Amino acid sequence: MDHLLNDTIEFLEKIGWHYRREEDTNLLALSLRGEKETYPMLIYAKAPFWICIAQLPWEIPDRNRLEVAEYLHRANYGLLLGSFEMDYDNGDVRFRSAMVRENRPMEESILDRYIKTPAAMLDQYAAGIQAIVRDGEIARHALEYSAVHRKGV
């Protein structure tokens, strides 16, 4: 088995998180409870790639997608560990953390950070997305709803 996949599975089991391995693949499916929502997640681990994606549990209505796309683009500027993305066709919003790594053992601290970051970022920026969808806020002003963005992290 691939070190990246094996280490990820061992880490998830050690901390007691439930996951489902997609049969005959290097994909793990799980959910992570953030402060505001529970986020469906996928982890792909096959050297040299390790990718974790968390998704908002609701879709962006078609009428709001351009404004949300601008919001996500503005939010992405300066992020160090991952990025937001949106599917224009169905309104799915996700955050992705990824690394390219040799097939060698992974430290738990790295796994912890790269697995938790996508859900944490969705938690931090979801209020701005909701302000656009519910209140008609514009992207530039919606960033003020994110404490992380205001702090410049």
What are these regions (language model features)?
Residues 1-18:
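Amphipathic alpha-helical segments
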Residues 15-39, 43-51:
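Ser/Thr-rich, low-complexity intrinsically disordered terminal regions
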Residues 50-58:
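Short glycine-/aliphatic-rich beta-strand segments at the starts of folded cytosolic domains
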Residues 57-59, 99-104:
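A short interface-forming secondary-structure element
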Residues 58-92:
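Short, internal acidic amphipathic alpha-helical interface segments
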Residues 93-97:
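Short, aliphatic-rich beta-strand segments
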Residues 111-112, 116-123:
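Long, contiguous binding/interaction regions
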Residues 130-153:
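Short, highly charged C-terminal tails/helix-capping segments
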